Amino acid sequence: MSATNNIAQARKLVEQLRIEAGIERIKVSKASSELMSYCEQHARNDPLLVGVPASENPFKDKKPCIIL
C-alpha cells in the first residue's frame, strides 16, 4: 500500500513540475516596466489616487449626527 502511495505522490509531483516548467517566464526588469506602464495608464481611474466624488461615496454620511 505504501509503495503505491509513493508512486501516486511521485506522479503528482512530476505532473506539477511539468506544469510549472511550461509556464512562460519573463525577466523582472521587463515585468516591472510593464507594471509601471500599466499603473501610469490607469492612474486616472484609481480611486485611491484621485479620490471618490462625495456624490458617489456610499460611506459618506448623508446628514450630520444630531447628537453633536
Curated annotation (Swiss-Prot):
- What are the UniProt keywords, alphabetically? Acetylation, Cell membrane, Lipoprotein, Membrane, Methylation, Prenylation, Transducer
Cysteine methyl ester modified-residue sites: 65
InterPro entries documented for this protein: G-protein_gamma-like_dom, GGL_sf, Gprotein-gamma
UniProt propeptide residues: 66-68
Compartments annotated for it: namely: Cell membrane
Gene Ontology, cellular component aspect: heterotrimeric G-protein complex; synapse
One Gene Ontology term from the biological process aspect of the record: behavioral fear response
Which tissues and organs express this gene's product? Expressed in a variety of tissues.
In-chain residues carrying the UniProt-annotated modification Blocked amino end (Ser): 2
Question: Per its database record, what is this protein's job?
Answer: Guanine nucleotide-binding proteins (G proteins) are involved as a modulator or transducer in various transmembrane signaling systems. The beta and gamma chains are required for the GTPase activity, for replacement of GDP by GTP, and for G protein-effector interaction. Plays a role in the regulation of adenylyl cyclase signaling in certain regions of the brain. Plays a role in the formation or stabilization of a G protein heterotrimer (G(olf) subunit alpha-beta-gamma-7) that is required for adenylyl cyclase activity in the striatum.
Family of this protein:
Belongs to the G protein gamma family.
Give the quaternary structure. Answer: G proteins are composed of 3 units, alpha, beta and gamma.
Q: What is this protein called?
A: Guanine nucleotide-binding protein G(I)/G(S)/G(O) subunit gamma-7
Species name for this entry?
A: Bos taurus
